[in-house]
Design a protein with these regions (language model features):
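Active-site core of PLP-dependent enzymes with the aminotransferase class I/II
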Residues: 1-3
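Bacterial carbohydrate/catabolite-sensing allosteric modules
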Residues: 6-7, 11-235
Length: 235
């Protein structure tokens, strides 16, 4: 949570009510969380593109102040850094910089459909030799695919694409989109079980000022991957 959302969140926590964050983590203050391996998911997606021979791989990222966006961007960079061939190809584009928006192969889509479309156009115009793109959020995936259609780009002949989440949308796109999937049902079950456990603990004790930092729990879940027809083998 950030900005106005964080203020509401802080007030809620101070009231003593149990809180479970889903796919978010607080930087200042401990809180129960249910998280997926966002870093690993992005890393795996980019590695899949590399195995197909892609070297110039763009990424449409989310906002800097969102935990999941930072983790997915980290996974993207780790995958590129682990490949000495890709690292040499993209050396000038992946240098550590104070402002990540200076990186040509990264474009911020702000986790929105419109943002995804705008970021896709920017990547395409700034990187004419880009052969693949990883889109790190569902809404941005929708926007990016809309822009790809508007630009007349053929997938995967001209550009390979891996999106994020929503199996139904991935199946509706032509060609079928390869996507990272999140265990939505497991996330909901884990969050509900954790919250119920906290409510039971609260009922069993009269001490409402107990130290939450000693009892917070983080549950990690793995993502999946659905192979479509949107990635070309250019190796």
């Amino acid at each position: 949570p950030s900005g106005a959302e964080k203020k509401v969140f802080d007030r809620f926590r101070k009231s003593g009510r149990p809180v479970v964050l889903i796919d978010r983590r607080m930087e200042n203050g401990d809180c129960d969380c249910v998280l997926v391996d966002n870093e690993g998911a992005a890393q795996n997606a980019v590695k899949r593109l590399m195995k197909k021979g892609h070297k110039k791989i763009g990424m449409i990222t989310g906002p800097d102040n969102v935990y999941t966006a930072r983790e997915r961007q980290r996974g993207y960079k780790l995958a590129l850094q682990e490949s000495s061939k890709a690292q040499s190809e993209q050396q000038s584009d992946l240098k550590d910089k104070t402002d990540r928006k200076d990186t040509k192969l990264l474009a911020d889509g702000n986790y929105t459909i419109a943002g995804g479309a705008k970021a896709m156009r920017k990547l395409y115009e700034d990187n004419p030799d880009m052969t693949a793109v990883f889109i790190s959020n569902y809404e941005m995936t929708v926007g990016a695919m809309m822009e790809i259609n508007d630009l007349g780009i053929k997938v995967p002949e001209q550009l390979s694409v891996i999106g994020f989440d929503n199996v139904d949308f991935a199946r509706a796109v032509v060609p079928r989109l390869s996507i990272v999937t999140q265990p939505t049902e497991e996330i909901g079950q884990a969050a509900a079980n954790l919250l119920l456990s906290r409510l039971e603990d609260k009922d069993e004790t009269s001490d409402k000022t107990s130290d939450k930092t000693e009892t917070t729990e983080t549950i990690w879940l793995k993502t999946g991957f659905v192979e479509g027809e949107s990635v070309a083998d250019i190796s």
